[in-house]
Regions:
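Short, well-ordered beta-strand segments in beta-rich or mixed alpha/beta enzyme
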Residues: 5-12, 42-69
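Short, flexible segments with low predicted structural confidence
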Residues: 3-5, 20, 36-38
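Short, surface-exposed ligand-recognition loops at beta-strand->loop->(often short) alpha-helix junctions
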Residues: 12-21
């Protein structure tokens, strides 16, 4: 059975190019939506800095992740990043680790927060 691939990237945008970078991220999310093996492909902004992002991708297998790396969507994204980043991104790739997804807990009882 193929093992999943999880890639997490820290992206460092330039404040003056924020709108362009966010538009590129949105377009890339849309462009990858139909790729085989794509389980999750999401860009998020950090809480403390509106120009720092986290990109999380989950792929069904090494093969589907590699296919994405060769895709037009990935290549278009990479080419468009050139003038939008303050410094190079940092990526961590996790392969085949067991994943546990706990059942969601209910909303907290507001009385317990006192």
């Amino acid at each position: 059975m193929p093992e999943p691939v999880l890639a997490i990237t820290q992206i460092h945008g330039i404040a003056g190019r924020r709108d362009e970078l966010r538009a590129l991220m949105r377009d890339t999310e849309t462009a990858t939506a139909a790729e085989e093996g794509r389980r999750l492909y999401r860009f998020t902004v950090t809480l403390d800095d509106p120009d720092e992002y986290v990109h999380v991708q989950e792929w069904a297998s090494e093969e589907t992740w590699k296919a994405h790396q060769r895709s037009r969507a990935f290549n278009d994204y990479q080419r468009s990043l050139f003038d939008l980043l303050a410094r190079p991104s940092e990526m961590a790739i996790h392969r085949g680790a067991r994943t546990t997804r706990p059942a969601p807990s209910g909303p907290p009882d507001p009385r317990s927060l006192d």
